[in-house]
Curated annotation (Swiss-Prot):
GO biological process terms on file: riboflavin biosynthetic process
Coiled coil regions, renumbered to chain: none
Leading EC class: transferase
Species of the source: Chlorobium chlorochromatii (strain CaD3)
Pathway(s): Cofactor biosynthesis; riboflavin biosynthesis; riboflavin from 2-hydroxy-3-oxobutyl phosphate and 5-amino-6-(D-ribitylamino)uracil: step 1/2
Name of the featured protein: 6,7-dimethyl-8-ribityllumazine synthase
Matching PANTHER family: 6,7-DIMETHYL-8-RIBITYLLUMAZINE SYNTHASE, 6,7-DIMETHYL-8-RIBITYLLUMAZINE SYNTHASE DMRL SYNTHASE LUMAZINE SYNTHASE
Biological function: Catalyzes the formation of 6,7-dimethyl-8-ribityllumazine by condensation of 5-amino-6-(D-ribitylamino)uracil with 3,4-dihydroxy-2-butanone 4-phosphate. This is the penultimate step in the biosynthesis of riboflavin.
EC number: 2.5.1.78
Keywords: Riboflavin biosynthesis, Transferase
Catalytic activities: (2S)-2-hydroxy-3-oxobutyl phosphate + 5-amino-6-(D-ribitylamino)uracil = 6,7-dimethyl-8-(1-D-ribityl)lumazine + phosphate + 2 H2O + H(+)
Matching Gene3D superfamilies: Lumazine/riboflavin synthase
A Gene Ontology term for the protein's cellular component: riboflavin synthase complex
Length: 155
């Protein structure tokens, strides 16, 4: 018995990608952008095929990501942001809605929207996940986007 195995490759050559980035906690968000751009370049993509959309906060990421996906200009969207827990329930609400909204936007548009939103307990954890001790989640999200576009192309 032979079962066909289909998976995406990691070539971004010719791929058009939108990065949607929240400005809140921008000093960390910019590191996520740098990680994503680095990943796309390392896998054959070019800056000419990328666009960066900046929105106020993580709550707006799903709306802007969906709009970019529906534009027909992009093969994938990468949503990047930073949500750090504070002393109120605001963190839980924003983290849940951003996560749910990004997933819903991807399902509704059938365009891969990679989730690169940090949800951390404190500033130190966010910094670690934006390029220091724990890798760069922007880089990881870009890898997901690239792989998903190539998987979709084989379906």
């Amino acid at each position: 018995m032979h079962i066909e195995q289909i998976e995406g490759t990691l070539s971004a050559a010719g791929m058009r990608i939108a990065l949607v980035v929240s400005r809140f906690n921008d000093f960390i968000g910019q590191k996520l952008v740098e990680g994503a751009v680095d990943c796309i370049r390392r896998h054959g993509g070019s800056e000419e095929q990328m666009a960066i959309y900046r929105c106020p906060g993580a709550f707006e990421l799903p709306m802007v990501s969906k709009k970019a996906a529906l534009s027909g200009k992009y093969d994938a969207v990468i949503a990047l942001g930073v949500i750090i827990r504070g002393s109120t329930p605001h963190f839980d609400v924003i983290a849940a809605e951003a996560t749910k909204g990004i997933a819903q936007a991807s399902l509704e548009t059938m365009i891969p929207i990679a989730f690169g939103v940090l949800t951390t307990e404190n500033l130190e954890q966010a910094i670690e996940r934006a390029g220091t001790k724990a890798g760069n989640k922007g880089f990881d999200a870009a890898m997901t986007a690239i792989e998903m576009v190539n998987l979709y192309r084989q379906m």
